[in-house]
Amino acid sequence: MIVSSKAERVQEAIRSIGGDARGQAVDVSDEKAVGSFFTNLGVFDHLVFTAGDSLQLHELAETDLKQARRAFELRYWSVLAAVKYGSPHIRSGGSIVLTTGIAGQRPQKGWVIPASVCGTIEGLTRALAIELAPIRVNAVSPGVVRTNLWQNMDSAERERFYQDIGKSLPVRRVGEAHDIAQAFLFLMKEGFSTGQTVVVDGGTVLV
């Protein structure tokens, strides 16, 4: 079941995946809507949470605190609501996989908010792994990946950014969505890992 706050993203994902994929638009910032969704969904095996708006990259002096709160609303409080209402419906042997990012481990200038959110999610992952055991709880920490997370940048500037980052990495390229998907699948299948953050960054933290 694919869920997004925006119906068009749900339909786009369904078309991309094909087969018998199903989806539903749910306002993930609305606690009651999230709770109702999981009640109606019933039992399932794995919860993967990847929601996030385009990154707001500003130095602290220029940071809009309203936007900063919005980032935490979507990327932390919405996660907490999804786990709170979703975890009781997870079958035995199931798991939860959250999404963080290398901003928490290797922040750049202007990344105050993304770094704060990522660090918070990594701490939450460890705490939930203890509290929700035996449900496994892990996180994936992507590096720079070609996704709409960077759509606030001008297209030409964004492409230069991708090229510059790619040249600096040991793998000589930025990530693609399918690179990151493999990490989520691994954590869903790997039954002896919990409380872990798997970094898939092309070597970003090394350089």
Q: Can you describe what each PLM-predicted range is?
A:
Residues M1-E12:
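Conserved glycine-rich Rossmann-like NAD(P)H-binding loop of the short-chain dehydrogenase/reductase
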Residues S16-K32:
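Rossmann-fold cofactor-recognition segment
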Residues V48, S78-G86, L124-T125, A183:
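Hydrophobic positions on the long internal alpha-helix
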Residues G52-R69, Q151:
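Conserved mid-core segment of classical short-chain dehydrogenase/reductases
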Residues A68-F72, Y76, A81, S95-A133, ...:
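Catalytic loop of short-chain dehydrogenase/reductase
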Residues E122, E131-R146, S193-V200:
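Conserved Rossmann-fold SDR core element
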Residues R158-D179:
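Catalytic Tyr-x(3-8)-Lys segment
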Residues R173-V200, V205:
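C-terminal substrate-recognition "lid" of short-chain dehydrogenase/reductases
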